């Protein structure tokens, strides 16, 4: 009898165990189905528009990974390249020079990027930067000028058009202080343009505290490299345009032999890599009225451009104490595109003759409507020319073309350049 009872008890135990196993398997399968349904439902709600049948396991896994990255690091931390902002549509600030804006390819200097303006002394670097500040202030922007050289001329800034009452000025004691306050301003998200004048004047604190004549090997280069790593991250989260003004030095040793660069910029190589645009500005001539020198002819070469084709050059006039002469730019470009007819010393505009360039400049200064009309014609002409160039390029790609290799000349990072200005388009070579 006891034997029979033991057999009955073991049979009941085995039946109970099998029932538990069946329930756990069924529960697990329902749980897995629920997870899959949630993943598909979530991917639908995110706007993918894919049906459950149309999404493979790989696509579901990718969507789950993207959702996890977005929830962990925020919106925009990962995206499809084709859905991002086009480089040609980035917001910009005008440089104050119509010819230079055209040469840059995007209409000005881009927000949220690093731009380097470098060149020899008295070439117009600070003047160009002040024009950018003036244009940004016209759009209601907040601007900061970090005067590391302690040499900003407020009267020149006013003459250019800068609202000095609303311009923030900092004259830091050392390079670390200057770059630290720049980073703080960028992170605030409330500043539109910051100009640092200049990289050569960003003296490291260790050099200031040392003795005269002490060797400080690559101290400034290390400072710039470390600072730019932080600043590039801060800029990626803001819409601040950061302009570094830089000087050039003679390069004494050239390991590349003859034909290598004879000039080099200050602060090491970090700025060259982090800058989205590098503008090399030079004085190429003087402007005289009789015996008096009233200004200089300036050439700006776009050595680096991440947003448009580089190696173009713009030429314009700088009037001493006034800045860029915009009317001269308009006249020169209008002659080039045949909106103004020139015959000797006479200029014909809308059927009226003007004897000499100065007479035409005076007329345009007094009649802003005619000046704006010429600007509108030039803009429409340049847009039409750009569209025609794109069609020509697409047609020429189908045909064999001759490639010409031109060696650069003996200046820092220079290459063949397209001139945008009064003169026709030319190619500069060694």
From Swiss-Prot:
- Entry keywords, A to Z: ATP-binding, DNA damage, DNA recombination, DNA-binding, Mitochondrion, Nucleotide-binding, Transit peptide
**Subcellular localization, per the record?**
Mitochondrion
One cellular component term from this protein's GO annotations in UniProt: mitochondrion
- The source's superkingdom equals Eukaryota
Region feature Disordered, mapped onto this chain: 385-415
Q: Which residues bind ATP?
A: 119-126
**GO biological process per UniProt:** DNA recombination; DNA repair
What molecular functions are annotated in GO for this chain? ATP binding; ATP hydrolysis activity; ATP-dependent DNA damage sensor activity; single-stranded DNA binding
| Leader sequence residues | none
Specify the transit peptide boundaries.
1-35
Q: Name one Pfam family in it.
A: RecA_C
Q: What role does it play?
A: Involved in recombination ability and DNA strand transfer activity.
Q: Family assignment?
A: Belongs to the RecA family.
**What's the protein name?**
DNA repair protein recA homolog 3, mitochondrial
